[in-house]
Amino acid sequence: MQLLNQIEKEENLLIEKVKNTLFLAQEKVNCSIEVCVKKTIGISVNIRNSIVENVEFNNDSILFVTVYNKFSKGVSSSKDFSTNGIKKMLEIAIDISKHTSSDFFSGLPDAKFLCFKAQDLDLFYPSEFNIKNAINFASESEREAFKFDKRIINSEGSFFSNHITIKVFANSLGMLEQYKSTRYSNYNCMIAKDNSTMQRDFSYSTSRKLDDLEKPDVLGQKTATNAISRLGSKKINTIKCPVIFSKETSSIFFSHLIPAISGDNIYRKSTFLLYDLKKRIFPEWLNIEENPHIKKGLGSKPFDSEGVSTTIRSIIKNGILETWLLNTYNARKLGLTTTGHSGGISNWLVSNKNISFKELLKMMKTGLLITELMGQGVDIVSGNYSRGAVGFWIENGKIKYPVNEITISGNLKKMWNSILSISNDVNMYSNIQCGSTLLSEIQISGN
């Protein structure tokens, strides 16, 4: 109850600061104004080998103001919420707008797109910031991993965090809305050793509600299992073969679609999908729906960073690219309307074939299961893809041995079109919710 009262008090204070900032701005200059404040309160704990290495308490607030002065834009921010601090921040934003080139496409979103009543998306599940409990939570996953098998010989650390975020947004068109959210995360990374090799692996979970987080003992056991399974890893010969991205790496694999269809890259003509709107870029059976309004969703939000209402929409329908991801500015540059994507995507739901992961392995028969990706070798201009990978070699639908020190490469457009199936083991710890993904063939570089 004490925490709830504190949060309510903080929220009311932030609302008053935003109102005051808007009032002071409108006194100073006759132009369009946008004000946003974000406050994050929380704790995070890192432990390693039962020793507490780091405990952090966060209580950070930042106020942003954007001024549109006859199509010239000025942006400033401050952590000083005093009246003098706000006035100084406004003066800086106004001064910047006077020295910025006029851009006809700059300005607030049209009022019809704004969110004047933010819906409750069930994102707020606060719990007390108890450092002792946080340390115990992080310690238990490490302790369980050590107990699981004698081959677990060291720890790279365990982590737990508990954070509350309050966001208040207003503009000179009359919008004033706010919402609160919580996020809990735990992570554990362990090292396994046998006679000849050492390997590390990790597990993690994240949720809006503490009770929905992976239990620390289960997390530790998963980490130990993952690390042990990688012992005896070896490099394979260079080959072209079928590949399965695990559910975790599938979320990463589909994330490359985001910059490829973002408005900034479209109007700058710096994406390999520039001419593919309303064209098929995935198999006909594949759909990606964006739903910003999933209760307790990790990517859920009632409005974007410009105050535009978020909406449910098809990103990919029957394999066809249905939309760009647009904010107000790049939408106007393209002669289109905003899609509510200022600040990024919300929740993407990637369709699957409703088969189990085991059935997916049987479907592949022989090939590579990828469980971790390394490096940043993705070129959005060309679509060329090259990343380090580790995983397991599969024969007759069963895991034969672990694999490391390989590179997978191809072109994203061809890779997306080569998707044969997706299993129903959906990754719920990402805002891109996807199962494991089977591709017909990909280049693997090894020996």
From Swiss-Prot:
Entry-linked InterPro entries: Metalloprtase-TldD/E_C, Metalloprtase-TldD/E_cen_dom, Metalloprtase-TldD/E_N, PmbA, TldD/PmbA_N, TldD/PmbA_sf
Keyword Hydrolase applies: yes
UniProt keyword list: Cytoplasm, Hydrolase, Metalloprotease, Protease
Location within or outside the cell: Cytoplasm
A Gene Ontology molecular function term of the record: metallopeptidase activity
UniProt GO cellular component terms: cytosol
SUPFAM superfamilies: Putative modulator of DNA gyrase, PmbA/TldD
Enzyme Commission number(s) from the entry: 3.4.-.-
Main localization, broad class: cytoplasm
GO biological process, one term: proteolysis
Pfam families: PmbA_TldD_1st (PF01523), PmbA_TldD_2nd (PF19290), PmbA_TldD_3rd (PF19289)
Sequence similarity: Belongs to the peptidase U62 family.
Function: Probable metalloprotease.
Protein name, entry field: Metalloprotease PmbA homolog
